[in-house]
Design a protein with these regions (language model features):
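Residue-level recognition of alpha-helix initiation/capping sites
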Residues: 14, 136, 146, 189, ...
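Structural motif corresponding to the C-terminal cap of alpha-helices
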Residues: 159, 198, 334-338
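Short strand-turn-strand beta-turns centered on an Asx-Gly dipeptide
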Residues: 6-9, 52-54
């Protein structure tokens, strides 16, 4: 245990691993683009740089706290540093912010506004790279990458896949799959974690919004939506509601107003999956099938086992995922002439 003076205020610490954690616990907002407590410390963006009483500057995310330290987090020097860092990042960044899928939710854009970066004094020196649309789950745009390394670390450290890594050095450095392959031709399991950790639009979720709107506009198409359990407690935060609050009723109301004819809860098919997997387990147990039985609820997990542990492929359940099972159930139900009203369109949320 020790005490650090931060901006003139004494703050006690115990077992915090770095200065950044202590500073944030003290209620001081330090900007970062590459730091995540779940990942290893990388120290790439340098936005969390602080100054000590001797005028020395260092990244707080990688600095071990010491008793008696005197730290300043918002001096004039630090403000200039941070503004310059944002400018340099933008100098090597694609600037089509108005049409970017991450516009309004981009950490780099937010920090540029915060530090008053209204223009960039430097020309973009990077050669434009092709956008990778090969994956069914994500879109990778290397022109918007700021080399924070978040996607590389989450793919390696948390997911254990290693589909992305750094290549080349200096001004030529970039993040890419091995041998610059398309992401779909790598060991990527389509988990989407890289997109969650990406602070810009370099990795975004692949969507089919246009197809959904076309289906909703077609009077001859019966459009069905199914909502995953996680969505009901996650979507509310985007509209200012308390995090974790269930908004299933609001979701159903909104989807009906948009034009969806039917809205189903994927939790129902999750129960179906449990029933089917239980039956499969009993069958394997009685008849000497491959054990242990591994769930097939998550397509990313199934692909991960197939790619990383091929010897265990036969251990994975043959059941569909809850979303796949719900889709099959609704398709079979409305295929019946008594229930059918023309074409069927389905949207998974």
């Amino acid at each position: 245990m020790g005490t650090i003076t931060i901006d003139g205020r004494k703050v006690e610490f115990t077992d915090e691993k770095n200065l950044l954690t202590i500073i944030r616990k003290a209620g001081i907002d330090i900007p970062t683009l590459c730091y995540h407590s779940e990942l290893s410390t990388f120290g790439a963006c340098r936005l969390c740089t602080v100054e000590d009483d001797r005028g020395r500057t260092f990244a707080s995310c990688s600095e071990e706290p010491r008793d008696g330290m005197v730290i300043y987090t918002n001096t004039g020097k630090l403000k200039r540093y941070r503004k310059l860092i944002i400018e340099l990042l933008l100098a090597a960044h694609c600037r089509d912010c108005t049409t970017c899928v991450k516009s309004g939710d981009c950490n780099l854009q937010t920090l540029a506004h915060r530090f008053g970066v209204t223009s960039v004094r430097y020309n973009n020196y990077r050669e434009q790279k092709p956008i990778d649309f090969s994956s069914p789950s994500i879109v990778r745009d290397p022109n918007k990458c700021i080399l924070c390394g978040n996607c590389v670390r989450v793919c390696n450290e948390l997911q254990g896949v290693g589909a992305l890594d750094f290549a080349f050095r200096g001004s030529e450095a970039m993040v890419m799959p091995a041998f610059d392959k398309e992401i779909a031709k790598t060991d990527c399991v389509n988990c989407g974690q890289c997109q969650i950790f990406c602070p810009t639009g370099a990795i975004s979720i692949r969507h089919n919004r246009e197809a959904v709107w076309e289906a909703l506009a077609d009077p001859d198409t019966r459009v069905i939506a199914q909502v995953a359990p996680a969505v009901r407690v996650a979507v509310g935060g985007a509209f200012g509601l308390p995090k974790g609050k269930s908004v299933m009723g609001k979701i159903v109301n909104v989807l009906h107003r948009m034009g969806f004819d039917e809205v189903y809860d994927t939790a129902f098919s999750a129960d179906l999956t449990i029933v089917e997997e239980s039956a499969e387990f009993l069958d394997r147990l009685k008849n000497g099938g491959k054990l242990p039985l591994l769930t097939s609820c998550c397509p990313a997990w199934v692909k991960f086992v197939g790619e990383q542990f091929p010897d265990y492929r036969e251990n994975v359940s043959t059941c569909r995922s809850p979303q796949g099972m719900m889709s099959a159930v609704t398709k079979e139900y409305f295929r019946n002439p008594e229930n059918s009203q023309g074409k069927i369109g389905r949207a998974h949320v």
